[in-house]
Amino acid sequence: MILKKLTPNHPDISALKKLFEEAFPESERPVSMDTILNYLDQIPCDLLGVYPDETPDEFSGFFFGIRGESSVYGVYFATRPDLRSTGIGGKAFRAIVEHYGDTQFWFSYESPFEESENAEQRERRRNFYLRNGFHETGWFTKLNGTEFIVACSKEEFDKEGFEKFMAAMAAGLPNPQALPQLYRRDIACEK
């Protein structure tokens, strides 16, 4: 799997924007891709395009993550709809995690424990992360009324590091209250 750093002028940006809007509901897109592209040089982040080894010029997906001192928060990861269930997502995801080495990697995904119209999709996403080596931390966040499970790449969740990371992110935002806060629930996260 080939990962390419994407910039606002990259030829695949229009395909990325289309995938961004298709893959994530509006409630999970508090900022536009244009806003993300404008901040690429201003915050410690990575926007990576995913390309198969066999067809290195074929845009297949993307990852957007924000780097902390010793961590990475995966904000968005998606593969093209026509490539889903082909194994490319798992290969790409493992390549992305490998790209960051021994860094603690965090992702959050919609909780399947809430009533929702996309319950089946939520369960598929959850299983994807668990199948690819992530661990549920027992912690949750809420963004725009939707509950998310926080998962990490290591068995032990660095909660203090996560909170420090979120506080640093909030310091640079015009509306720091928009960032999700950690909380626990009384439900067991069954694997």
Predicted regions mapped to residue ranges:
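Conserved beta-strand in the GNAT
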Residues: 49, 56-67, 71-78
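Short hydrophobic/aromatic beta-strand element in the GNAT-like acyltransferase core
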Residues: 45-50, 62, 148-150
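Short N-terminal edge-element motif at the start of the domain
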Residues: 22, 36-37, 62-66, 80
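Conserved acetyl-CoA-binding loop-helix of GNAT-fold acetyltransferases
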Residues: 79, 85-99
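Active-site rim helix/loop that mediates acceptor-substrate recognition in acyltransferases
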Residues: 21-54
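Short amphipathic alpha-helix that is part of the acyltransferase structural core
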Residues: 1-33, 149, 160-168, 175, ...
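Conserved GNAT acetyl-CoA-binding A-motif
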Residues: 100-121
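Conserved catalytic-core motifs of GNAT/GCN5-like acyltransferases
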Residues: 117-119, 124-148
